[in-house]
Amino acid sequence: MSEQTFHGTTILCAKRNGEMVIGGDGQVTLGHVVMKGNARKVRRLFNGKILAGFAGATADAFTLFERFEGKLQTHNGQLMRAAVEMAKDWRTDRALRKLEAMMLVADADNMLLISGTGDVIEPAHDFISIGSGGSYAHSAAQALMENTDLSAKDVVEKALNIAADLCIYTNHNLTIESLNKED
């Protein structure tokens, strides 16, 4: 019997005109079966001031969100500091090292990708994506950012829907969270 693995998801973060947005789909797939269509893979952390989304094994997400929120508390909401400390732990902690996931995190000004290999990456553009449909969402977001005046929220929604049309591990049941610089 072959080992079945959890697949999927698409998470996209975009920033425009003082608005930071992270969105993700809700599909959880085990092997060739959709197990759940309405999972929440995007959350608000640290009293709503930080947005986070994950791609990877669903069970791992809860551990990652909890750990990252702890780092935010320890470092008083400093996104970069919390991300670097989280990545360090992820790389060195035996239990965390086995987690197969990636996270996008953002405050009102900055967005970061945190990987299980200990990388903390700040994107070159005002958008970044992860997950099985990440390249589709990234391409769509780039076209929308370069050729329209859509808000960050609209870019995220449209790009995720395009990814859902193309990626079998991504659906149209979206969760979208946003922060405004003025908040």
Swiss-Prot record:
Allosterically activated by HslU binding. Transmembrane segments: none annotated. The keyword Ribosomal protein does not apply. GO terms for cellular component: HslUV protease complex; proteasome core complex. Its EC number is 3.4.25.2. Its main location: cytoplasm. GO terms for biological process: proteolysis involved in protein catabolic process. The keyword Cytoplasm applies. It is an enzyme of class 3 (hydrolase). Keywords: Allosteric enzyme, Cytoplasm, Hydrolase, Metal-binding, Protease, Sodium, Threonine protease. A double ring-shaped homohexamer of HslV is capped on each side by a ring-shaped HslU homohexamer. The assembly of the HslU/HslV complex is dependent on binding of ATP. Protease subunit of a proteasome-like degradation complex believed to be a general protein degrading machinery. Belongs to the peptidase T1B family. HslV subfamily. This is ATP-dependent protease subunit HslV.
